Amino acid sequence: MISTLLVGFGFSATTFHLPFLNYLPQFSVDVVISSKPDVVNAVLPHAEVYGSLEEALKIHDVDLVVITTPNHLHGPQAKLALEHSCHVLVEKPFTLDSEEAEALVELAHSQNKQLCVYHNRRFDGDFLTIKQLINDGKLGDIKRLESRFDRFRPVPRDRWRE
């Protein structure tokens, strides 16, 4: 059984990660970092909920840490998890700069741990189709591709991430 700690319990955690973690029998979501323990316990009554990753890692020996927090926290939280000998799956963007990313890759290698960036749409049909068209040369010599995706909403909401 792979003991898993989920950092954050918002849209990404509950939509992209938790369904897989709950479905696959080799994973057990034992610890969650969230500011809303009542929301977590309604979905995962067996999970222990903490307000900080530092606090949870002092108490629990987990195998995997899944990071679904705001972007600026990804790097520091991945580092902390690796320093506690955990495998890490982190939402995109991995880090805010390449130096931090390279340091984390080196740390993971030195700890002999897996460090993976999660791209939730990597294997979606639309992206696979574009990849195939490019590989087949049907779109010519592409120099740049710009793509926008707004969750199928005709009008974007007024939020800091959007």
Question: Regions from the language model: what does each represent?
Answer:
Residues 3, 28, 61-64, 87, ...:
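Structural signature of beta-strand start/N-cap positions in the alpha/beta core
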Residues 24, 44, 59-60, 124:
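Acidic-histidine catalytic/liganding microenvironments
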Residues 47-107:
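Beta-loop-alpha module in the N-terminal Rossmann-like domain of NAD(P)-dependent dehydrogenases
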